Design a protein with these regions (language model features):
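Short helix-boundary/capping micro-motifs
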Residues: 12-29
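Conserved amphipathic alpha-helical core elements
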Residues: 22, 40-41
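A short LG(V/I)-centered, amphipathic sequence patch enriched
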Residues: 41-60
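Interdomain hinge and pocket-entrance segments immediately C-terminal to HTH DNA-binding domains
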Residues: 54, 60, 84-103, 117-122, ...
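Central regulatory/effector-binding core of bacterial HTH transcription factors
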Residues: 91-154, 224
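A late-sequence structural motif
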Residues: 106, 256-296
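Hydrophobic hinge/microswitch elements
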Residues: 129-142, 148, 201-257
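Secondary-structure junction motif
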Residues: 148, 180, 193-214, 279-288
Length: 296
């Protein structure tokens, strides 16, 4: 196999005309130059140099190799510099997938802090709810997935690096003027006869489970993945809802009141990545900034 260090020596010999001059240029000994040239000729399978008097002359094969060496070595140098920039966080790219309420609350502060600390790092953002976002991570379509789960699902993320960020409590949402709008806390069973407005499929399943545990099945009249739409429907008096605190934080409820719901239901917000990706400097830095944003 032809090695880059051998090409550098060959180019120096071709430029200077002798092993001794090449050794001086490269800062090594003449025997070292001779040894590397022998190794290069063995790899090439043909002579690359011939001695003419006191000078070394390139053979046809040597001329061909030197002709390509400059481009090869320049490309290798550029690659080394680019990799060093990525390793040193002077450059890098991170593909982030987040659920909508995470995009509007956690992500902006995290990315602003990342840009301030490492302006050469570029982050792209697309939105997807779990489990789709987790599938994208496993399929190689993103580097970090901001996701959530209710309770603990055994083995769900065992193949991933899980960075816990925060616990997000579900909050009740009722129209202004509702009989429970001024209550300090509301038992979920007190809303058994209400029309319900449900959120994303995973949140919807959790709503049904919580209600059924309290002895009733919610009558879901409207369902939408768009949390501002849920809040708008509640504000219009079309029903009640239970939403994550992050979702309500990102939109000012108009015509609706938030109430504490008992029993408490929480979801775990996490950042997920693959074990190998967790060692990539730009990914690790982004995970750190997401964790910091979650504590603000």
């Amino acid at each position: 196999m032809i090695e880059a260090r051998h090409l550098r020596v060959l180019r120096a010999v071709a430029t200077t005309g002798s092993f001794s001059a090449a050794a001086r240029e490269l800062g090594c000994t003449q025997p070292a130059v001779s040894q590397q040239m022998k190794a290069l000729e063995a790899s090439a399978g043909t002579p690359l140099l011939v001695r003419t008097g006191r000078e070394m002359r390139l053979t046809e094969a040597g001329e061909a190799l030197v002709r390509h060496a400059s481009g090869i070595l320049a490309g290798l140098t550029a690659a080394e510099e680019e990799v060093a920039a990525i390793a040193g966080l002077r450059a890098g790219r991170v593909r982030l997938v987040s659920f909508p309420s995470g995009s509007s609350t956690l992500v902006p502060g995290a990315l602003a802090a990342l840009r301030a600390a490492h302006p050469g790092t570029q982050v792209s953002l697309v939105e997807a709810e779990p489990p789709r976002s987790v599938e994208m991570l496993r399929d190689g379509d993103c580097d970090i997935a901001l996701a959530f789960r209710y309770g603990t699902t055994g083995g769900e993320w065992d193949d991933l690096v899980v960075r816990p960020l925060l616990t997000d409590r579900l909050i009740g949402l009722v129209p202004d003027g509702h009989r429970l709008a001024d209550a300090d806390a509301v038992g979920i069973g007190e809303l058994a006869d209400e029309s319900w407005i449900a959120g994303c499929p995973r949140c919807r399943r959790q709503l049904v489970e919580v209600c059924e545990a309290s002895g009733f099945t919610p009558r879901i009249d409207f369902a939408t993945d768009d949390y501002p739409a849920v809040i708008g429907l509640v504000g219009a008096g079309l029903g009640v809802a239970v939403l994550p605190a992050l979702a309500i934080e990102s939109v000012r409820p108009k015509g609706a009141r938030t109430v504490t719901v008992e029993p408490a239901v929480e979801r775990e917000i996490v950042a997920l990545t693959l074990p190998d990706l967790a060692r990539v400097p730009a990914v690790a830095a982004t995970l750190d900034q997401l964790a910091r944003a979650a504590t603000r």
